[in-house]
Amino acid sequence: MNSFLKRVVCATAVAASALALAACGDDEGESSEPTPSSAESTELTPVKLQLQWFTQAQFAGYFAAVDQGFYEDAGLDVEILEGGTDIVPQTQLAQGRADYAIAWVPKALQSREQGAGITDVGQVFQRSGTLQVSFKDKDITTAADLKGKKVGNWGFGNEFELFAGMTKAGIDPGKDVTLVQQQFDMQALLKGDIDAAQAMIYNEYAQVLEAKNPDTGELYKPEDFNRIDWNEEGTAMLQDAIWANTEKLESDKAYQDQTVKFLEASFRGWIYCRDNAEKCRDIVVAKGSKLGASHQLWQMNEINKLIWPSENGIGIVDEAAWDQTVQVAMETKNAEGATVITKAPEGLAYTNDYAEKAVAALEADGVDPNGADFEPIEVQLEAGGA
C-alpha cells in the first residue's frame, strides 16, 4: 500500500503463469491509474528543483524528501540543483532549465513583471528571516535608531525590508543614514566598519555568535547584540516559496498532477525536519554544506521557526502577508529610487489550489501540516560553526 498517494493496489491471480495487478478505486470510489508503487509503474518522473543558494539547512526539507524517499513514493525522481551568486532560480524556471524553483516572493514578482511566467504554488516560509544586527552599545533597537548611523545592506533586492522600515520610521534612506555595501558575511560589523549589519537569522546572525569576543576570549552571546526584526516592525516580506511554470499550470494536466505530488512530498520533508532537526542537520552536512554541523543545526532550528506554526497549513499563502509584501515591493524605493515592482502583480501570481490539495492529502494520512505544537530546540553553536 502506498499511503502517500492514498491508493490500494490489489493483486489477483488470473492464470498459473501470470499475475495481473490492477489499481483499485481511491477513498472516494473512483477508478485511477496504477500508482508508482505498483508493478506496472516502476518508472519515476524526472523533476529538477532549483535552489536559490548553496546546500544548507535553509533547504533541508527538500533534501530530506529525497533522503527519506518521499519523492520516490510520489513517483518522482527529483534532482536538486544547487544555487549560487550567479544563479537566479526563477529565471532558471522560466527558461525551462528547472521544473520548480525556490525564490523569495519580491524577487520573483520582479521577474514576473519582466516577463517570467512563474507562479507561487507553495509558500513554505510564513515569516521573514531578515534582521538588522548591531552591538548593544550602539543602542539601535528600532528602525528610527538607524538615523545618522552607518548601515550595511547587501543590495541586489535584499534591502527593501530595511528601506521600508526606515521610511516608515521617518528616515530618508538617501539622506539620513550612511549606506554601506555589505558583503554576505558579518566581518564589517565585527570590525566596527558599520554600525548595523543585515543578517538572516538562520545564517549571518549565527556567524556573529560563532565569533570570539576579543574582550572575553569566549564566543559572543545574543545579549551582546540588538536585533531589529522586520516582522515586528511591520515591513516584512514573504521569502522562500516554491514556484512553478504558469503556462504548464494552466494547460498541462500531467504537470498539474505532478505539482500536487511534488508539494506533498516536499511538505513531508519539511514536516520530517520539524520533528527531526538533528537528523535533517546530518542530511545537509552529508550533502556537503559549506558551514559545519552546529551552524546547520542552528539554521535548521531557525528555519523551523519561520515555517511553524503554519496556521492554514504548510505552503498556504496568507493573504495579508502577501498583500503586505506586494505593498512594500510597490511603494518602497531603494537608494537609487527604484522599487521592486511598479504595479500590482497580474495574472496567476500565486495560487493555493495545489498546496491545499497536498495539505488535504497529508491530513487524510494523519500527518500534521500545521505544527501548532511545534517547540524549537536549544542549539549550542561552536566556534566557526563547526
Label the predicted regions.
Residues 1-11:
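Bacterial N-terminal signal peptides that target proteins for export
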Residues 10-18:
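Hydrophobic helical h-region of N-terminal Sec-dependent signal peptides
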Residues 19-23:
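C-terminal motif of bacterial Sec signal peptides marking the signal peptidase cleavage site
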Residues 25-28:
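Bacterial signal peptide processing site
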Residues 33-182, 186-191, 195-201, 222, ...:
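Short, glycine-/small- and polar/acidic-enriched structural segments
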Residues 106, 138, 184-187, 194-290:
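Pocket-lining segment of extracytoplasmic ligand-binding domains
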Residues 252-338:
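Secondary-structure end/capping motifs
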Residues 323-386:
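Conserved C-terminal helix/tail region of periplasmic/extracytoplasmic solute-binding proteins
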